[in-house]
């Protein structure tokens, strides 16, 4: 209802904006017309900010509706204009870029102001402590005084506070999108990094949502990083609120990769690319788009067998890609679109079993000191797949025997002697991080039932000072996973 009220108030300006954009699309660069468009946009922003500043904490009207009714329309216009301008018309392109940059700057100021206002008015830093750092470092400060702050009641999980969090989340997404558009249209260096930074803030605001994951994947896809983009699109699909565009984006990436494999006659430079190709073939083999490029089924079967007979410690197994691809594989099986794919599920069982025994072998060799500690970085990615499968079939544990799981837990406990102890106590919140570990929703529901806690259980972990260790991220995951295994077997 609140969105409707705000929409009615800006309806007149929206009509003016659409008319001005239509006029701008009909001819070349018109400075006065673009100034009029930006003036309309600023007027809409002022109205929404005034409403935001005047509301009480027991009511809420969302200022982020301006994205769909105003900002996105203008961005789409500029993107089409850049495509239409002839390469020889350098002056027109330069003028259009200048106006577009001015527009993006006003948008960024608006969203930064909205975030600061919402954090202060609704005391959102009591939900997300990192907001304190945002309000102290944001380029636009809040206009709420200390007296007003002291009269605001202590934050609680009310509907209005949650709507405010969602609004802040959307503002971070839009700031990231504008940084991304700035990079693609204006060729500005570092804009992709800024976009990823805003998407990370969105993740820390509402980690269960999927839109920021989809946008991160779009950044990687723009940079032609196929493995990373597929991982993030799959992560978006199995989030609590998967965006509609994530599935289409994922299929586009899989089709593009499949065609690339066809172009090189299905000759692969590493086992990881074989794995990604098999997953792609399972997911899109029936789509008409790939029929002219389709690999014979007997060749796919040979590739599967060669992959599952290889050793995870070979040079061709890039640890980073193993993490991304095995995680994406796990995520896909928990997406509604793919969970009925029998061929994909069948290969997933075989791959998971192979990955489990490879992990167990790595842990044994590290324990017996026949292999360096760095081997742990080879086996850690597989834990994500193993845990997802084990927890999905809990309490029967499915295809992994309990005694095998106990062996893995035992060897991991033995391996702890290779790392320094630390008195610092870290917390792992599974409810917020389950997507990062590839844990399915049924796992969260199980823990909600067992613990009767809407937030989910927090596990104490005592890792070493991994900030200075050469394998810092792997060690951090190692300790987190060890605690999860111990919890499973307790």
Swiss-Prot record:
GO MF, one annotated term: enzyme activator activity
Keyword Nucleus tagged: yes
Pfam families: EST1, EST1_DNA_bind
Localization of this protein: Nucleus; Chromosome, Telomere
Keyword Ribonucleoprotein: no
SUPFAM superfamilies hit by this protein: TPR-like
Primary localization: nucleus
One of the protein's GO biological processes: telomere maintenance via telomerase
Gene3D superfamilies (UniProt xref): Tetratricopeptide repeat domain (1.25.40.10)
Keywords: Chromosome, DNA-binding, Nucleus, Telomere
GO cellular component: chromosome, telomeric repeat region; nuclear periphery; nucleus; telomerase holoenzyme complex
Coiled-coil regions listed: none
Top-level taxon in the UniProt lineage: Eukaryota
Known function: Directly involved in telomere replication. Associates with telomerase and during its interaction with trt1, telomerase activity is promoted.
Assembly and oligomerization: Interacts with trt1.
Family: Belongs to the EST1 family.
Name by which UniProt lists this protein: Telomere elongation protein est1
Organism: Schizosaccharomyces pombe (strain 972 / ATCC 24843) (Fission yeast)
